[in-house]
Amino acid sequence: MWTCPWCGRTFAARNQTHTCASLGDLEAHFARSETSVREAYDAALSVVRALGPVEVLAEKSRIAWHVRMSFAAFQPRASWLDGHLVLAREIPSARWRRVEVFSARNVLHAFRLRGRADIDDEFAAWLAEAYDVGCQRHLGR
């Protein structure tokens, strides 16, 4: 693991390209959101925290989750939570708003959550797969 000497963030790759920006306030991301939006976020985070440590990065325009690499990001809206998971494979599902294949083991799956009920067993399994990507287990690390 490499730690940026300027901002203190950790990355799997030495000299990882990133923006050294101070992190924002997590609560500010939800200031204009309905309670159900925060409940969906908290339910998803609870699933991931049960898997192991995760760094929550409240950036200027999004909230990112990071272990060795970022594996999920969220943008709270007034009535829903937009986000994406990075998975090591393409998973067909009507629940995805879009899927972008960057490489064979780097596939972005965009979603929209409206409440805690959206964090069901299926979504929890996808969170676990994304967490493994964040740990780089899909690369044998």
Regions found by a protein language model. Name each.
Residues M1-R141:
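Charge-dense, helix-prone N-terminal extensions
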